């Protein structure tokens, strides 16, 4: 895992995960910088799948491709078998993949309204 002091590497890893989600047709992909807002992590990456199967597939793809491309392994994983809300904790960034109904219900972007939206770099996974 990159050190907390290595902010550019963390940003690059979060961008790479975003590109993986976009490559797998995730919807409404948003990257939030939590710098100055929270001490628990640097970034939240939020996306939606179109169905339980798509949500599971997106979560699995991020885990597999991040390990293959960067050697990064999620420290903690939740919700993968259900496919409603998958959480992948990479310590310095956290990936949330939602079924659309749950994303609408929890409105996680509103909970973190003070966080800065970071533009996603197209092609970060290449």
What kind of region is each of these model predictions?
Residues 1-31, 35-36, 53, 57, ...:
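Long, contiguous binding/interaction regions
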Residues 58-63:
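Short amphipathic alpha-helices in soluble, non-transmembrane regions
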Residues 46-48:
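Short hydrophobic/aromatic beta-strand micro-patches
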Residues 65-96:
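Mid-chain, well-packed structural core segment of small domains
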Residues 38-42, 89-91:
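A short, glycine/Asx- and small/polar-enriched loop/turn
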């Amino acid at each position: 895992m990159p050190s907390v002091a290595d902010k550019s590497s963390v940003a690059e890893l979060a961008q790479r995960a975003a590109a993986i989600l976009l490559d797998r047709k995730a919807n409404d992909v948003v990257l939030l910088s939590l710098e100055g807002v929270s001490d628990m992590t640097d970034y939240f990456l939020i996306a939606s799948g179109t169905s339980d199967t798509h949500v599971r597939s997106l979560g699995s793809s991020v885990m597999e491709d991040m390990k293959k491309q960067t050697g990064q392994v999620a420290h903690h994983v939740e919700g993968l078998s259900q496919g409603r809300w998958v959480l992948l904790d990479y310590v310095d960034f956290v990936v949330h993949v939602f079924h659309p109904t749950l994303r609408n219900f929890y409105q996680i972007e509103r909970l973190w309204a003070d966080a800065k939206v970071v533009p996603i770099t197209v092609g970060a996974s290449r």
